[in-house]
Amino acid sequence: VLNAADPLVVGMRKYCDGSVTFFARDPDNAVVREHLSTGGRAAYVRDNSVILAEGDAETVLVSLERVPLTHGGLVPFQVDNVLAASAAAWAAGLPPDAIARGLATFRAGVGHAPGRFNLFAIDGLTIVADYGHNVSALNRLLSVLAAFPHEKRSIVYSAAGDRRDVDIIAQGEMIGRHFDRVFLYEDTYLRGRKDWEIANLFKQGISLGDRTKEVYPIKGSLAAILRATETATPGELLVVQPDTIDDGIAFWNVIQSRGGREITMSEAVACDVEIRESRFGRAAHAGRAFAPGDVVVKGRGPVIRERTKYTIQIDRDLH
């Protein structure tokens, strides 16, 4: 099972003794189309549904709206994971209905996927827990966080000691461009590095950014996470990278004991609104200024000129 969207992975095809199944979010991916034209297998997304294809035959496996891990298809890297898992299960001989049931019942929370883009809320604070420890993982995470409305952002982060200096510094620079407060921890995976050597490399990178104002080196993953949580303010976004999955579970237990709860992506990206009276009746007003490109509301269905109680006004004459 190979990622058709990554040229380096596509090149591994020549080393595969068995049959190859490709996956890609884009149904028009050139590698996927070429592979299908020769009768090969592929998994991709069309109309927000997972498709299993072999040659010209397509099977609609499941809508991403029914796959909790992807948060309705809003988290691209989790969609990739679902495509890869679906392709692997299919190649192993599982029937499509069994694969679909598995995807629909595998949750995005701590119980099924601890440390893999778990979302929490507590006392007005939104928390994202993700275990990614490298440039690629951080880049993908940041692309998803761009949809979050939170203005103030903090992160708890580190890296294993066997990462290259240039990669640690690069992660620091990315963090320095996206977060106001940074909590750097050192814990389990020094792997030959001296104490605080990793944190100092991160600081080099953070200094290249233009956003971070506060940096706190802290010994221990869980200690750093708790410090960040206890000093956060309502309305803030806190990104937490546990040092180990066990730390992630321990953190969730603390959050739960204090009244926190797991939330969905839709809840996490929702903007604060106020309900006010207007000449049209009660109306929702944004609780903050929107930026260009922000999604205000989503709806499905045809655009019509008649106003009904089931329509949303999107222009002066369109509903």
For each predicted feature, which ranges?
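A short glycine/serine-rich beta->alpha loop
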Residues: L69-P76
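Phosphate-binding loop of NTP-binding sites
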Residues: L2-A4, L8-G18, Y310, I314
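Asparagine-centered polar/low-complexity signal
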Residues: N3, Q78-N81, N134
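Glycine-rich nucleotide phosphate-binding loop and flanking beta-alpha elements
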Residues: P7-V10, N29, L190, D246-D247
